[in-house]
Amino acid sequence: MAFTQALVTVLALLAGTLPHRHSENSPPKKANGDKCVHHTQCSSDCCLIDLERSGAFCTPKSRIGMGCLPQTKGSLNIMCPCRSGLNCHSKDPTCPRRCQMI
């Protein structure tokens, strides 16, 4: 009986502390062009550093033929990963990676 009560208490604590993916309290995703500090804030999942505009802004993922990075690491990007259905690839190690259909 004590084990069951302890288990219920632990589950209740975990349920209250774990973030919900689609909670009513979670802020809406930002549109392209909006300022951001982390890629998860953007509806495109890409927060790109823009030195000319002195900040970071949500931007669309890279299209076919555009420069890319294979994945998002950290909170900000210097290049965005590819859109769905494209792969970030380079045929030659000395050439920059580009989004391609493979």
UniProtKB/Swiss-Prot annotation:
Predominant subcellular localization, coarse grouping: secreted
A molecular function annotated in GO for this UniProt entry is: enzyme activator activity
Gene Ontology cellular component terms for the protein in this record: extracellular region
Key words of the record: Disulfide bond, Secreted, Signal
Q: Which cysteines are joined by disulfide bonds?
A: C36-C47, C42-C58, C46-C80, C68-C88, C82-C99
From which residue to which does the signal peptide run? Answer: 1-23
Q: Where in the cell is it found?
A: Secreted
> What biological processes does GO assign it?
digestion; lipid catabolic process
**InterPro entries of this UniProt entry?**
Colipase (IPR001981)
TM ranges: none
User: Which PANTHER family does this UniProt record tie to the protein?
Assistant: COLIPASE, COLIPASE-LIKE PROTEIN 2
What the record says about family reads: Belongs to the colipase family.
- This chain's protein is named Colipase-like protein 2
Q: What is the native source organism of this protein?
A: Mus musculus (Mouse)
